[in-house]
């Protein structure tokens, strides 16, 4: 009897302990802060999505978590990217030559139309007072393509002629004349042999963009809203799904003795740049299993010598050397960062196993698993020329880099230039049922089937198209909301061209250029012939291109 009594007492103790655990767990769940949206990462993507959602659903609560001590300190930082407002005006890799010798401009049209959405989104934010002083983040900077050699000159002329079929590119000028090109870019022509066969295109509607400044202003605005909180120096350590379909996300405060913090979020966006893949994998969603990643860094030669800088106002893109992958395209760029004008030349590829400039050398190893190791190895075989190129880049000396600069700036002096390590880019490798693994172009939205969590992978064209990329994300994860009259009306108010193929309407192009140039305080747009019909196949999907063509350094 005593023995039975002891067993009962033991059971009571166990049950009491279990009840206490359940009660504690329930109390913990009840105490955990609830938010509608959690933004992981404090860069251009997360901040853009935050502003979009605040416009469309101002009553939603949002929390942003950033690992570093401030926002826009990684890839969005002005010193960690080339600051090109990518619109395919100058980048030759967006207009590949087909087997029949014709130039395919479908990708260029797609990129350009996306950038027009960004211009409209930024213009609206200026009108609302969210963004202030447009010259602090965007400035008119002509975009140029510059080539030499008979084959390259022939290609550039064909490219120019093909692009004239689209109203988006009709402000472009073409020249093979030494003196004309010297008027556009004196620094690139002085000291050059007049007999060298050169050609250039020039368009005044190009831009230089400080994505770090846009990010800081976006987050600065969001911080003034009562339902937004920002947590800096906060590293996400755990992402788990709750029974009700929400996500429990925990993070630790770095450089602090504060206890870990957590939220339960209805929707999680992982906009952590190079850190996004690891966090998507940590969430356990099956959609993340298809992806691996390969990090590529970039460095630039930089000068801030006023005598040099005043001679160049352009972003001048070249053509990859014979035998080199298209990602190796060098460019000589005017930059305006925090009010100071500088010139960058590059990029030169660098390698690190880090996925972020401020990341860990174990990033590559931590992201590799049984699901993606085979696709990654397959890409290494299929993209061997790319591997060779990267290996060659790592062996470059200071003299090699300076000699590359002199091909664009013949009178360059070594003492005027210094080498700057820019940011890391993580290129997507996706499992493929036929090839095993493929290197993916551009950026890719990875979302759970129910749309409760999503992340952005990839690099190019990246920040330039943050507004349309986040609009696409909302159409994917908030499909029902986007379809409502309220959201539709607001989206069209922010982006007047929403749902319109600008390529098919020269009048709409002029209207959009004029509106955004005025609000963003850019140079007046070029005049185009409204009577000339658009003959470009902008409605056709962009043709698949070699993946390395779109790799972003």
UniProtKB/Swiss-Prot annotation:
- Tell me its EC number(s), please: 1.1.5.4
Keyword list (alphabetical) reads: FAD, Flavoprotein, Oxidoreductase, Tricarboxylic acid cycle
Give positions of region: Disordered: 524-553
The main enzyme category here is: oxidoreductase
Question: What does the record give as the reaction this protein catalyses?
Answer: (S)-malate + a quinone = a quinol + oxaloacetate
Asked whether the keyword Iron is assigned, the reply is no
Pfam families assigned to the protein according to its UniProt record, in alphabetical order: Mqo
Coiled-coil regions listed in the entry: none
Q: What is the required cofactor set for this protein?
A: FAD
Can the keyword Oxidoreductase be found in this entry's annotation? yes
Any single GO BP term: tricarboxylic acid cycle
Please give the pathway this protein is involved in: Carbohydrate metabolism; tricarboxylic acid cycle; oxaloacetate from (S)-malate (quinone route): step 1/1
Highest taxon of the lineage = Bacteria
The terms under GO molecular function for this entry are: 2-hydroxyglutarate dehydrogenase activity; L-malate dehydrogenase (quinone) activity
Similarity comment text for this entry: Belongs to the MQO family.
What protein name applies here?
Probable malate:quinone oxidoreductase
Which organism is the protein's source? Burkholderia cenocepacia (strain HI2424)
Ranked from the top, the taxonomy reads: Bacteria, Pseudomonadati, Pseudomonadota, Betaproteobacteria, Burkholderiales
Name of the gene this protein is made from: mqo
């Amino acid at each position: 009897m005593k023995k039975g009594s002891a067993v009962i007492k033991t059971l009571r103790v166990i049950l009491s302990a279990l009840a206490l655990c359940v009660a504690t767990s329930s109390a913990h769940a009840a105490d955990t802060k609830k938010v509608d949206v959690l933004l992981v990462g404090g860069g251009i993507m997360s901040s853009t999505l935050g502003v979009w959602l605040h416009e469309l659903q101002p009553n939603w609560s949002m929390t942003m978590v950033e690992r570093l001590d401030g926002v826009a300190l990684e890839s969005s930082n002005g010193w960690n990217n080339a600051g090109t407002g990518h619109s395919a005006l100058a980048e030759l890799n967006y207009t590949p030559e087909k087997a029949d010798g014709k130039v395919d401009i479908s990708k260029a049209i797609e990129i350009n139309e996306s950038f027009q959405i960004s211009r409209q989104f930024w213009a609206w934010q200026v009108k609302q007072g969210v963004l202030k002083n447009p010259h602090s983040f965007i400035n008119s900077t002509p975009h140029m393509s510059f080539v030499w050699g008979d084959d390259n000159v022939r290609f550039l002329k064909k490219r120019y002629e093909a692009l004239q079929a689209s109203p988006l590119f009709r402000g472009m000028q073409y020249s093979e004349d030494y003196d004309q090109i010297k008027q556009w870019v004196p620094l690139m022509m002085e000291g050059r042999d007049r007999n060298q066969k050169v050609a250039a295109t020039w368009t005044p509607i190009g831009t230089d963009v400080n994505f770090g400044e846009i990010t800081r202003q976006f987050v600065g605005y969001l911080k003034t809203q009562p339902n937004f909180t920002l947590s800096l120096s906060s590293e996400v350590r755990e992402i788990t799904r709750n029974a009700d379909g929400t996500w429990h996300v925990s993070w630790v405060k770095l450089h602090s003795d504060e206890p870990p913090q957590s939220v339960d979020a209805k929707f999680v966006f992982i906009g952590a740049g190079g850190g996004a893949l690891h966090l998507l994998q940590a969430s356990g969603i099956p959609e993340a299993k298809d992806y691996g990643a390969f990090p590529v860094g970039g460095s630039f030669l930089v000068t801030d010598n006023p005598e040099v800088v005043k001679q160049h106002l352009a972003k001048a893109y070249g053509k990859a050397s014979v035998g080199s992958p298209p990602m190796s395209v060098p460019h000589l760029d005017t930059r305006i960062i925090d009010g100071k004008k500088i010139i960058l030349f590059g990029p030169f590829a660098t390698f690190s196993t880090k996925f972020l400039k401020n990341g860990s050398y174990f990033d590559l190893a931590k992201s590799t698993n049984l699901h993606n190791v085979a696709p990654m190895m397959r890409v290494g075989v299929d993209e061997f020329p790319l591997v060779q190129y990267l290996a060659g880049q790592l062996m470059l000396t200071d003299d090699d880099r300076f000699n590359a600069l002199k091909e664009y700036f013949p009178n360059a002096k070594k003492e005027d230039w210094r080498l700057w390590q820019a940011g890391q880019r993580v290129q997507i490798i996706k499992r493929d049922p036929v090839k095993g693994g493929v290197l993916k172009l551009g950026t890719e939205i990875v979302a759970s089937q129910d749309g409760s969590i999503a992340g952005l992978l990839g690099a190019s064209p990246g920040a330039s198209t943050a507004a349309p990329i986040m609009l696409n994300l909302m159409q994917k994860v908030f499909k029902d909301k986007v379809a409502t009259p309220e959201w539709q009306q607001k989206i069209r108010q922010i982006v007047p061209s929403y749902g319109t193929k600008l390529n098919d309407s020269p009048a709409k192009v002029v209207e959009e250029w004029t509106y955004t140039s005025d609000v963003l305080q850019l140079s007046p747009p070029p005049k185009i012939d409204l009577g000339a019909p658009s003959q470009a196949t902008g409605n056709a999907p962009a043709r698949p291109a070699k993946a390395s063509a779109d790799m972003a350094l």
